[in-house]
Regions:
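C-terminal catalytic histidine-bearing segment of alpha/beta-hydrolase fold enzymes
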Residues: 143-175
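A conserved short beta-strand
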Residues: 84-100
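The feature captures the conserved acid-bearing segment of alpha/beta-hydrolase catalytic domains
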Residues: 98-145, 149
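Active-site catalytic motif of lipid deacylating hydrolases and related acyltransferases
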Residues: 2-61
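Gly/Ala-rich beta-loop-alpha elbow adjacent to hydrolase catalytic centers
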Residues: 65-74
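Active-site signature of alpha/beta-hydrolase-fold catalytic machinery across serine-
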Residues: 76-80
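Conserved alpha/beta-hydrolase fold motif
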Residues: 63-66, 90
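Glycine-rich phosphate-binding loop signature in dinucleotide/nucleotide-binding domains
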Residues: 2, 55-60, 84, 168-175
């Protein structure tokens, strides 16, 4: 990553975010700018989309790292924003893509993510979750045209994230 590239971290929604989780610590050690969901207990899709658009527009180039609900945000944003060309790549960890009909009622401002190939290279790193099964995460990876390494233990997740971070040229061999 060059000096003109910004790493943007889109964490999970506040109910499920774990500030001490290794993924969050990893993003912070890489100098990531946090673009977090502010609404609690109901995450607001529109508010977070505006924050992401502003963050991307303020950077000449950026990489996105998203976890859980943040992955749905990236997909929704890429479907409408013309700023996607500033994104070098995206790392999507354990995607969770609810819609307004989600049984919890917490996602009433969210719409179903439009199944489409993302306009930038991406990796989906699977993460076991009661909200999003691995098979569903693999389906999102295929839909988005993302590299899918298969199920990984936590050590494998960290290795995959480091590979994505350190070797952009290796990523392009997957696309």
């Amino acid at each position: 990553m060059n000096a003109h590239t910004t790493l943007l971290w889109l964490g999970d929604d506040p109910l499920h975010a774990r500030p001490a989780a290794w993924q969050t610590r990893w993003a912070r050690t890489q100098g990531a700018r946090m673009v977090l969901q502010h609404a609690d207990p109901v995450p607001l899709r529109g508010d977070w989309l505006v924050q992401l658009e502003s963050a991307v527009r303020s950077a000449p180039r950026c990489r996105l790292v998203a976890q859980g609900l943040g992955c749905a945000l990236v997909a929704a944003w890429a479907a409408y924003s013309s700023s996607w060309a500033r994104v070098e790549s995206a790392l999507l960890i354990g995607p969770f893509c609810p819609d307004a009909a989600h049984p919890s009622g917490r996602y009433r401002t969210w719409r179903a993510v439009t199944p489409m190939r993302l306009p930038f290279s991406s990796w989906v790193i699977p993460e076991p979750s009661p909200r999003s099964h691995l098979a569903e995460q693999q389906q999102w990876a295929a839909c988005w045209g993302a590299y899918w390494p298969g199920p990984l233990d936590p050590a494998g997740q960290r290795e995959a994230m480091q590979a994505w971070w350190q070797d952009m040229s290796a990523q392009h061999t997957f696309f």
